[in-house]
């Protein structure tokens, strides 16, 4: 991914995604190439609220939240592809996940690197290949399908 690298800080991310604490799971975009892919990161802190119950004696980031982090990175790539006319009223919905696999636990102190590659766009559905890594090792991977709607439209 490297012809034109776009780097987004948390301030720009907050203008593009409707998510807020505790569910905003992208801290920074390291690289973004429209029509190709995105590389983003999530710094995983012991202060994450989900660690209180998952699991108190051995905190592990829930796999579903790793997938959510990948979906949020995909949303940022989508919004780079197709700028929403009304960002305040635009939502990004999951419509499917294929081949989700979890290969390594993600623990407090890890830096989760989110790599999402554009696969195709057909009839309002975006498809992506998504891989989350820690220290260069795959933690999770999946194919994600998503759509963009206005907040007042049914998903």
Curated annotation (Swiss-Prot):
GO biological process: fatty acid biosynthetic process; lipid A biosynthetic process
CDD domains: FabZ
Group of enzyme by EC: lyase
Location in or out of the cell: Cytoplasm
UniProt xrefs under SUPFAM superfamilies: Thioesterase/thiol ester dehydrase-isomerase
Reactions the enzyme catalyzes: a (3R)-hydroxyacyl-[ACP] = a (2E)-enoyl-[ACP] + H2O
GO molecular function: (3R)-hydroxyacyl-[acyl-carrier-protein] dehydratase activity
InterPro entries: FabA_FabZ, FabZ, HotDog_dom_sf
Superkingdom of the organism of origin: Bacteria
This protein's UniProt keywords: Cytoplasm, Lipid A biosynthesis, Lipid biosynthesis, Lipid metabolism, Lyase
The enzyme's E.C. designation: 4.2.1.59
Main location: cytoplasm
UniProt keyword annotation of Lipid metabolism present: yes
GO CC, alphabetical: cytoplasm; membrane
Catalytic center residues: 54
Annotated family: Belongs to the thioester dehydratase family. FabZ subfamily.
HAMAP family found in the cross-reference section: FabZ
Entry function: Involved in unsaturated fatty acids biosynthesis. Catalyzes the dehydration of short chain beta-hydroxyacyl-ACPs and long chain saturated and unsaturated beta-hydroxyacyl-ACPs.
Descriptive protein name: 3-hydroxyacyl-[acyl-carrier-protein] dehydratase FabZ
Organism encoding this protein: Burkholderia ambifaria (strain ATCC BAA-244 / DSM 16087 / CCUG 44356 / LMG 19182 / AMMD) (Burkholderia cepacia (strain AMMD))
Native organism taxonomy: Bacteria, Pseudomonadati, Pseudomonadota, Betaproteobacteria, Burkholderiales
């Amino acid at each position: 991914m490297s012809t034109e690298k776009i780097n987004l800080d948390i301030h720009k991310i907050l203008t593009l995604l409707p998510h807020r604490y505790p569910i905003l799971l992208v801290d920074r975009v390291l690289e973004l190439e429209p029509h190709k892919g995105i590389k983003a990161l999530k710094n995983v802190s012991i202060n994450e609220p989900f660690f209180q119950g998952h699991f108190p004696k051995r905190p592990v980031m829930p796999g579903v939240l790793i997938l959510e982090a990948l979906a949020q990175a995909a949303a940022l790539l989508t919004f780079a592809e197709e700028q929403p006319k009304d960002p305040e009223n635009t939502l990004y919905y999951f419509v499917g996940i294929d081949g989700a696999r979890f290969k390594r636990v993600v623990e407090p102190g890890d830096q989760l690197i989110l790599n999402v590659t554009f696969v195709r766009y057909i009839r309002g559905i975006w498809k992506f290949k998504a891989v989350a890594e820690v220290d260069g090792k795959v933690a999770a991977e999946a194919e994600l399908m998503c759509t963009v709607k206005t907040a007042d439209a049914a998903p």
